[in-house]
Amino acid sequence: MNEEERVGSSSSSSSSLPVSYGVDCEKYDFSSSVSSLSQPFSPEGSSNKSHVLENNLSFVFSLDHNSNSSLMFPRDRPCSCLHHVFEWILQRCCGCLC
């Protein structure tokens, strides 16, 4: 599809929502429906790889080089990375693990 066809097809109808084209002429249709808000600007057939990467990480390791044992924090409970950093600082400074 050349540039003239793209411009003509997106501006030919003033009542419809605009159409945008991304990399490799992927077509993105804008929609006013609520169901389209879950994955905006996502072409059909694409997958969200960040969820796959996050689900494969099961442990967070400590970077404490002074101790011989490596600390592992299981990720079975919901907590933030900041909580893990705080635990690491407490363990390193005062030897306690919350």
Curated annotation (Swiss-Prot):
Q: Which GO terms describe its cellular component?
A: cytoplasm
Q: In which tissues is it expressed?
A: Mainly expressed in flowers, to a lower extent, in roots and, at very low levels, in leaves and stems.
Q: Summarize induction of expression.
A: Reduced levels in seedlings exposed to abiotic stresses such as mannitol, drought, polyethylene glycol (PEG) and abscisic acid (ABA) treatments.
Q: Which keywords describe this protein according to UniProt?
A: Abscisic acid signaling pathway, Cytoplasm, Stress response
What's the chief localization of this chain?
cytoplasm
Highest taxon of the lineage: Eukaryota
Q: Which residues form the signal peptide?
A: none
Q: Which GO terms describe its biological process?
A: abscisic acid-activated signaling pathway; cellular response to abscisic acid stimulus; regulation of pollen tube growth; regulation of proline metabolic process; response to water deprivation
Q: Where in the cell is it found?
A: Cytoplasm
Q: What protein name applies here?
A: Protein PROLINE CONTENT ALTERNATIVE 22
What is this protein for, i.e. what is its function?
Acts as an opponent to RZF1 during early seedling growth in term of proline accumulation in response to dehydration and abscisic acid (ABA). Confers sensitivity to abiotic stresses such as ABA, drought and osmotic stress (e.g. mannitol treatment) by preventing proline accumulation and by reducing the expression of dehydration-inducible genes. Promotes the production of lipid peroxidation by drought stress thus leading to malondialdehyde (MDA) synthesis. Prevents pollen tube elongation. Necessary for RZF1 expression in seedlings.
Query: Can you tell me which residues the record assigns to a coiled coil?
Result: none
- What is the consequence of disrupting this locus? Reduced sensitivity to abiotic stresses including dehydration and abscisic acid (ABA) treatment. Slightly enhanced pollen tube growth.
